[in-house]
Amino acid sequence: MEYFNVGKIVNTQGLQGEMRVLSVSDFAEERFKKGSQLALFDDKDQFVQEVTIVSHRKQKNFDIIKFKDMYHINAIEKYKGYTLKVSKANQGDLQEGEFYYHQIIGMPVYEKDRLIGYVKEILQPGANDVWVVKRQGKRDLLLPYIPPVVLNVDVPNKCVDVELMEGLDDED
């Protein structure tokens, strides 16, 4: 079965079985909602078990979650450092124009017909996502995911078209 990363358990939260998760999910509110099915993977990326979310809330930059049948710190402490993943079957359907991060990472990024680089990772610093574009012989480019910059994301043909606004590329 194919799985995709949605977060990393970085610590426990209190004594009642809550965990602090650093999300890397494109749809965190959907992914961590009550009833969601996720999988735990250990630090060697080995499947451990399926889990069900029973509660979720945001606190600062973290998602605080609790699993079904794990209601005390002693039951969850061993999961610190583990990765949460969603199976392909549990990803859910997308609306037109939406996509998953794993579909974008690795895509080539073009301005007109000039290859700029490849999407290396996607950051979530605040109001909009920022795509990190790895370029050959240059520093990584931080590309805000906003309409004037990202013109088209063609998932089937695996390419991203952009228009770099003045000041975005400090190496040109």
From Swiss-Prot:
Main location: cytoplasm
Keywords: Chaperone, Cytoplasm, Ribosome biogenesis, rRNA processing
Spans traversing the lipid bilayer: none
Molecular function GO labels: ribosome binding
Keyword Cell cycle (UniProt): no
Stored InterPro entries: PRC-brl_dom, PRC_barrel-like_sf, RimM, RimM_N, RimM_N_sf, Transl_B-barrel_sf
Domain PRC barrel positions: 95-168
Classification via Pfam families: PRC, RimM
SUPFAM superfamilies, per database record: PRC-barrel domain, Translation proteins
An annotated GO cellular component: ribosome
One BP term from GO: rRNA processing
Location in the cell: Cytoplasm
Gene3D superfamilies for the chain: PRC-barrel domain, RimM
Assembly behavior: Binds ribosomal protein uS19.
Assigned protein family: Belongs to the RimM family.
Function: An accessory protein needed during the final step in the assembly of 30S ribosomal subunit, possibly for assembly of the head region. Essential for efficient processing of 16S rRNA. May be needed both before and after RbfA during the maturation of 16S rRNA. It has affinity for free ribosomal 30S subunits but not for 70S ribosomes.
PANTHER family to which the protein is assigned, alphabetical: RIBOSOME MATURATION FACTOR RIMM
Domain notes: The PRC barrel domain binds ribosomal protein uS19.
Protein name: Ribosome maturation factor RimM
Organism: Streptococcus pyogenes serotype M49 (strain NZ131)
